[in-house]
């Protein structure tokens, strides 16, 4: 311990003799900040769902991208009945069930309400969904969909493509709004696109958000970036421009142009 005062005195002496330019260089090295911090903070691969979560962290977002990974639509060993009875179907699960129905409805048919009920029951009979899940499906909204302008467009379309997966390279700044010029790989699934009788490509995304008439702008603002990414991916894949893109609002039972 007796040596400590001598050591401190020596260190103090050396510190006083440090050149100013050496001190400045030392500060630069100690407090150096990487100039491309956005690049290392940005993932090289992401999904449209993740992008939406960043923009709307409090929103329950449902799309066919999530549907493709849902375990409840894959055959598994049946759970005990008492467990199934205790489970409740969440709003997100209800949205996923509606997406599943839209995917499987036959656009060449003119469904009656009774036929829609039979369609849902058939999903149960084929073990695609459970009885409890079928009870959570809004039959009226499915029927409204088959009477919508969109449904009539699909009936007359040259081609109809559902649940189309895609990958696309985009600039990080276009996705996250940061300063990075790096490319990131974005993956997702397009709910629906079709080619109409005029040869135009129409892009559609189903949304189950609860909104009122007159609040369509909320959906447009919330999902415009998502559909912009879908449009870029589709145009890159088909080498042809998308003529129009729509949100189909399940709640309102109509298409909303973006």
Residue map of PLM features:
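Structural signature of nuclease core domains in nucleic-acid processing machines
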Residues: 1-258
